[in-house]
Amino acid sequence: MKPYLLPPLAALVLAQLSVASCDGGSTADPGPPPDAKLDQANRAGTQALSMDMPSLAVTQYKTALQRAYERDDAGAIADVSYNLALAQMKGGDAKAALATVRDARLDLERRRAPVPAELFLVQAAAAYRSGDLTTADSAAQEALGRVSKDGDTAPRAWFIRGLVAAQRGDATALAQAIAKLPPSKEADLQADRQELEGRAALLDNRATDALDLFQRAAANRQQALDYRGMARALALAADAASRAGRTAEAADLAMRAGRSALLQGDTATALPLLRQANELARQSGQSGIVDEVARLRKVAAK
């Protein structure tokens, strides 16, 4: 059950230098005054990211980060590095995100400035997407051990720890992570809990329960405008449906997951899902899905 992607970190509030600083400065030491060039580039990056333009966001955040280093501002370095890593993650470049976090951490540690929890969180997410479960788990634990200005940091760190536990087949650790995610009215946080509960159900061989949970998670990801997370949940639902012997439903879910991934530009994820959908559709005699998969493959080949 290979994960398609990481938790919806792009839904986290992007730090804006004019209103927040990851170093938690006090009123006695407010730090340097705002810098128009830095703030403008940072805001432009945030706007680009909100419009699903991660490449442009990366360019703008790199400009802002260069300015932050130019003025030797530890708080700005932490803030903008976090934003840049998020944009790199959304653009599918987890390795670049890890490098961004590494550079920021080294700079902050050399000057004995505190490393904010959010940097550890995005490191955990990038490591998980890269397949480094050990680093993902340890970075998530670091995030949990630090004070954060964002109340969502802790539940998202527990979500990553839960994903790691599920990958390892560790039902006990997965149950612990689920227990740390209380019910929430926020769609994305609801989806986090439902996804972990679905993974726990699969570990317990309760495929039908898992299918229901993953479908509910997909609906909540959609409500949160997290289409990458929605596609992942649909792919997990397809796996659960297949395990439950519901081949026709699995074919439809896999096709929808693959189509969404393809239209997001993630061909590497889309093609295996479309192949799975094609095989399941042929097994269940669904010519309509076979035809749709063929059409989507032509789109991918262009």
Please give the residue ranges for each predicted region.
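Short coil/turn linkers that connect adjacent helices within long alpha-helical scaffolds
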Residues: 30-32, 70-73, 109-113, 147-151, ...
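Residue register of alpha-helical TPR repeats
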Residues: 39, 79, 118, 156-159, ...
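N-terminal leader/linker segments that initiate helical-solenoid repeat arrays
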Residues: 13-14, 18-79, 83
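"A position-specific structural signal for the A-helix of alpha-solenoid helical repeats
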Residues: 43, 76, 83, 122, ...
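Amphipathic alpha-helical segments of tetratricopeptide repeats
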Residues: 63-67, 102-109, 141-146, 178-186, ...
